UniProtKB/Swiss-Prot annotation:
NCBIfam families: L17 (TIGR00059). One of its GO terms (cellular component) is cytosolic large ribosomal subunit. This is Large ribosomal subunit protein bL17. The gene is rplQ. Pfam families: Ribosomal_L17 (PF01196). Belongs to the bacterial ribosomal protein bL17 family. The keyword Ribosomal protein applies. Coiled coil: none annotated.
Length: 116
């Protein structure tokens, strides 16, 4: 049963939502910080933490799962090399969400997601 297992819908069809989160995750891993809406930031946090946990595991199966999700293969290899030394002693909480001023056009709540 899937009680209490809600995923953020983000008002998008499933394929567009997955593509959006994959793109945001790739950009966050590459640049270290991303500015987006607060709802997208909360959804992005889950996916990014999952990728970093896979990188800390370091197994071949984990590497293949990460390559299947992140768009850039070289970025995955770099993440797997650096994750153990950067997040080795940390049990989750690899990202930080900082709220910023609302977007000027539609007044939606904005946030910056950054890697700790």
């Amino acid at each position: 049963m899937r009680h209490q297992r809600r995923i953020p819908q983000l008002s998008l069809p499933a394929d567009q939502r997955k593509a959006l989160l994959r793109g945001l995750t790739t950009q966050l891993i590459r640049e270290g910080r991303v500015t987006t809406t607060k709802a997208r930031a909360k959804a992005l946090r889950n996916e990014t933490e999952r990728m970093i946990t896979l990188a800390k595991d370091g197994s071949l199966a984990s590497r293949r799962r990460a390559i299947g999700y992140v768009y850039d293969k070289q970025l995955v290899h770099a993440l797997f090399e650096k994750a153990q030394e950067r997040y080795g002693d940390r049990e989750g909480g690899y990202t930080r969400i900082v709220r910023t001023t609302p977007r000027r056009g539609d007044n939606s709540e904005m946030a910056i997601v950054e890697l700790v």
